[in-house]
Structure formats: structure tokens, C-alpha cells
A protein has these predicted regions:
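Conserved signature/switch motifs of ABC ATPase nucleotide-binding domains
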Residues: 64, 95
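ABC-fold ATPase nucleotide-binding domain signature/coupling loops
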Residues: 2, 29-56, 60, 121
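Helix N-cap at the start of a conserved alpha-helix in ABC-type nucleotide-binding domains
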Residues: 80-81
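Short active-site loops of ABC-family nucleotide-binding domains
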Residues: 76-77
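ABC ATPase nucleotide-binding domain helical subdomain, centered on the C-loop/LSGGQ "ABC signature"
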Residues: 7-43, 87-88, 96
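Conserved H-loop
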Residues: 96-104
């Protein structure tokens, strides 16, 4: 997360800082308490908790609307109900996006159509 305003941090690297859906994305990602702080300048990497940083990443996804979403341990700092809510949110808001996740929790399987498990000896689809 770059230093500067929270608005710049949420919109990093290439989202319009005045995106009309910015407040809505934060609210959907359970970060509504940050809306009033968008123009505050600070070291947000240190100010926000690991879970908040992960939810900021989900807000970026909602704003950027990518066709391909790659998530590597993207919910490791979140509890399982919040993880489930965010994955459901992505599926609902971005139904045509491809989501590829890497994670250790078995709870991620329900949000994906296909799974691949990697073991020491190799992988199994």
C-alpha cells in the first residue's frame, strides 16, 4: 500500500481516485468506517490491520472490475464468515470474472468451480 492519502492507497495503482463507486466498494467490503478518512494522509500499511488491508484489496477488485482475479492467501487475516462474504460479493458483483485463488483453507472450495491440490509428491486435480 503506497503512502499518501487513503484514497490514493485504495485506488492504487490505476483506479480513478474520484471513482463514483469508491464509497460503495468500501461499504460492501465492510470498510465503511474508512470513508470519512479517505483524504487523510498517512502510512496506511501500518495504520490498517492485516484484515483491513485485505479488504482494501477486495475493494480495489470491485472498482477495477478485472476479467481475471488472482488471489494468493487474500483472506488469510480474515475470519471465515468475512472470507465467505467477500467471495460471495465478488461472485455477485463480477459474475463474468475468472477467480483463481491460492489458499490453505478448505472453505475456499465452495467459491470455485474447479480445485487443484498440491501435495509433496505432485498435484491432484
Amino acid at each position: 500500500v503506497p503512502q499518501g492519502s487513503l484514497r490514493e492507497a485504495v485506488c492504487y495503482p490505476n483506479i480513478d481516485p474520484h471513482h463514483p463507486e469508491l464509497a460503495q466498494a468500501l461499504t460492501l467490503c465492510r470498510l465503511e468506517k474508512l470513508i470519512d478518512k479517505l483524504d487523510e494522509v498517512g502510512n496506511w500499511q501500518q495504520t490498517l490491520s492485516p484484515g483491513e488491508l485485505q479488504r482494501v484489496a477486495f475493494a480495489r477488485i470491485l472498482l477495477g472490475k478485472p476479467k481475471l482475479i488472482l488471489l494468493d492467501e487474500a483472506t488469510s487475516a480474515l475470519d471465515e464468515p468475512t472470507e465467505a462474504a467477500l467471495y460471495r460479493l465478488l461472485r455477485r458483483q463480477l459474475p463474468h470474472s475468472i477467480i483463481v485463488s491460492i489458499g490453505h483453507r478448505g472453505t475456499l472450495a465452495e467459491f470455485h468451480d474447479k480445485s487443484m491440490y498440491i501435495a509433496r509428491a505432485g498435484c491432484a486435480a
